[in-house]
Amino acid sequence: MRRRGQLTTAVAGAALLLGCVAHPAVSQPDHDGRRVLVFSKTAGFRHDSIPAGVAAVRQLGERGGFTVDATEDAGAFTSANLRRYDGVVFLSTTGDVLDAAQQTAFEGYIRHGGGYVGIHAAADTEYDWAFYGGLAGAYFQSHPAIQQAEVNVEDRAHPATSGLPRAWERTDEWYNYRSNPREHAHVLASLDESSYTGGTMNGDHPIAWCQNYRGGRAFYTGGGHTGESYAEPAFLAHLLGGIRWAIGDAQADCRPENGYRPLFDGTSASLAGWQQAGPGSFTLDDDGTLTSSGGMGLLWYADRSFGAYSLKLDWKTSGASGDDNSGVFVGFPPSTDPWSAVNNGYEVQIDATDVPEKTTGAVYGFQSADIRKRDRALNPPGEWNTYEIRVQGERLRVWLNGVKINDFTNTDPARSLRDGHLGLQNHGADDQVSFRDVRLKELPAKPSVRTASQGD
């Protein structure tokens, strides 16, 4: 697989050539841009939407700057050929489509950092190949008739779902799965089983998810049965975001996420426990986004303080200047003065330019983030990022889009992380930073031996 790096100019592929790897209309050296292989071989039911799906991925390649080849020839699955691609899309494949040698080559490709995208019947594929089952996340079990349903968008930062409404209504053939992937994959969206008939997953029905799997990246969406799906702008944006993440052009936290409770869920009701300290404010947008204005002030969670916890939240800078300033404060006492948080707590910074200990991912003024890891994990201005801030005892750790970038221990006797409040900073008139979905899970006061041994 080619080296992951910054996106450069690329072109989309030419017309679909069945039975062989299609060559792009304009050929390029492998180091120029990204390349994606669409694989649509079927050994069982064949979806008549496959040609529309191939054409759609080609169009997404034009929009996203990656070259698209398409094939139904399993002979493309050799180690040498797969190294040409940053991602492989299984487009409504069915049945046993690869032989043992081809499976081994694909496993090696994933283990060396390759990307996988599964669309719809990719979950109805290779039931006797355990590696593939883990990669896809879940196997197909059954489906009711095509009908409209409501999709609950659970992750509003991942590029596959960040542009979707929280409640997304669309028509498709809705799969039931043999198992629930939630424990080992990161669920991006799920079906509201009360909104349609035929759901059999007892009210917890994931329909799109992502995961880091055996060295590679895997994204799956259950949509895409109908040809009309590939003309829907929202579904195409969903698919493009999934491909971009799988091939490494966008970053996201795809670790499993369970047991969190919302502190802010995008509704005005969830702001009841928060108070504004100091000048400025936050505006709640129609899509459930909080955006800072003026300052310097602090929107802090006044309902209660916290000791040991994992705090997750999604954030982005405006994209206009690329240098907006904000931060997430932890471990401070209750106060109507925003400077109390500065002087008594700790800030995990959001700021593109300053000295290292005062830029994004830093514990502001105390410890820089790992700059190399931070820069690789960071999405650019205008795109969403996810922080996890984990506090246990006097230890504070920071993950950016699933990558640990800071590990700080408080030694200042005048400050303590063992109990304190949380807050979001509105820094000034020229700084516009947006937040979504602030959620928290309480933890034991000390990391478990197993967690510590894993380097978490």
Please describe what each predicted stretch is:
Residues R35-K41, F45-D124:
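Helical hinge/lid and interdomain linker segments adjacent to catalytic or ligand-binding clefts
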Residues G44, I146-Q148, S195-Y196, H225-P233, ...:
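Active-site rim elements
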Residues G95-L164:
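A glycine-rich, often tryptophan-bearing local segment used as a flexible ligand/cofactor-contacting loop or short
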Residues T42-F45, A74-A76, T93-V97, Y116, ...:
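Solvent-exposed loop/turn segments at secondary-structure junctions
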Residues D30-R34, S40, Q59-F66, E72, ...:
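Extracellular ligand-binding/catalytic regions of CAZymes and related secreted enzymes
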Residues A138, S142-G215:
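Catalytic beta-strand/loop cores that center a nucleophilic Ser/Cys/Thr
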Residues R2-S27:
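Secretory targeting and sorting signals
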Residues T125, A138-S142, C254-D456:
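Carbohydrate-interacting regions of secretory-pathway proteins
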